[in-house]
Amino acid sequence: MKLVILLVVVSAMLVLGGAQTASQFYCGDFLARTMSILCWPDMPKRSGSQYAGYGWPWLPPFSSSRGKRGIVDECCYRPCTTDVLKLYCDKQITI
């Protein structure tokens, strides 16, 4: 009986531990929300109307944060982990 309980606990740890490091595709709104949760978990959500006046011609260009590849190259076109996403938290994000 103790062996069965031990096997169940070890199996649960493996399943839960593997879920945290699994690679996944992060694109569009899902990428933005995930970055928001990872980088700024305590920030309150803002409404979209605050950004209505901002658009492409007025936004400054971003510099590369990890060479020529950006977060979309690493996590939208190819699967990546949350550990890779966290590398972009303190940097300007390139699309």
Swiss-Prot record:
Gene Ontology CC terms, in alphabetical order: extracellular space
Propeptide, residue positions: 47-67
Keywords annotated in UniProt: Cleavage on pair of basic residues, Disulfide bond, Hormone, Pyrrolidone carboxylic acid, Secreted, Signal
Source organism superkingdom: Eukaryota
Coiled coil feature spans: none
Intrachain disulfide bonds: C27-C76, C39-C89, C75-C80
Pfam family, one: Insulin
Signal peptide: 1-19
Residue numbers of Pyrrolidone carboxylic acid PTMs: Q20
Location(s), subcellular: Secreted
GO molecular function (one): hormone activity
Further comment found in the protein's record: Silk worm has two kinds of PTTH: 4K-PTTH and 22K-PTTH; there are many forms of 4K-PTTH.
Role this protein plays: Brain peptide responsible for activation of prothoracic glands to produce ecdysone in insects.
Family that this chain belongs to: Belongs to the insulin family.
Subunit and partners: Heterodimer of a B chain and an A chain linked by two disulfide bonds.
Protein name: Bombyxin C-2
Organism of derivation: Bombyx mori
Gene: BBXC2
